[in-house]
Amino acid sequence: MSKRNQVSYVRPAEPAFLARFKERVGYKEGPTVETKRIQPQLPEEDGDHSDKEDEQPQVVVLKKGDLSAEEVMKIKAEIKAARADEEPPSADGRIMYRKPVKRSSDEKHSGLSASSKKKKTKEEDEINKQDSVKKNSQKQIKNSSLLSFDNEDENE
C-alpha cells in the first residue's frame, strides 16, 4: 500500500534526432502540468479598459437636455467612488453574502409590484361592476328619450 504513494513519473530524455528537428522547425514547447499550476501575475486594472483618452466615445450634444462631456466625467467619478466604498473581496476568495437592505413602504408601492391572480380577478370584478352600474344608469336615461309608441296611440 505504501509503494503506491511513492510512484512518480520520470520523463525520458528526448532523442537527438527529435531535438534537432524541433530546433530547425522552431518548435516551441507547450505548457506542461507544472507550468499550468503556476498562476501568472496579471497587472491590476480598474476594469476600465476603454477609459483611455483616445478611446473614449465622442460626446455630441444635440439638445439642451443632453449630457455634456463634463457631466459624463462627473457621473463616472461618482461610479468609481461608489465602487471604492464597497468592501473589497476577501483575500481568500470566498464569496460573502449579505442580507438585502429593507425598503420602506413608500418604495415598495412606487415601483413595479407583483400581485396574485386572485387579487387581479377581484379588482377586475369590482371595476366591471362599477362599469356595469354606470352603463345601466345610462341605458335608463337613454330609454326615456327613445321613441315611444304610446304617444302615437294616444294621438289617434
UniProtKB/Swiss-Prot annotation:
Region span, Disordered: 22-64, 81-156
Domain of life: Eukaryota
Coiled-coil regions, chain positions: none
TM stretches of this protein: none
Residues annotated with N6-acetyllysine modification: K108
Biased composition regions of type Acidic residues, renumbered to the chain: 43-56
Positions bearing Phosphoserine: S50, S148
Keywords: Acetylation, Phosphoprotein
PANTHER family registered for this protein in UniProt: GEO02494P1
Record's protein name: Uncharacterized protein KIAA1143 homolog
Phylogenetic lineage: Eukaryota, Metazoa, Chordata, Craniata, Vertebrata
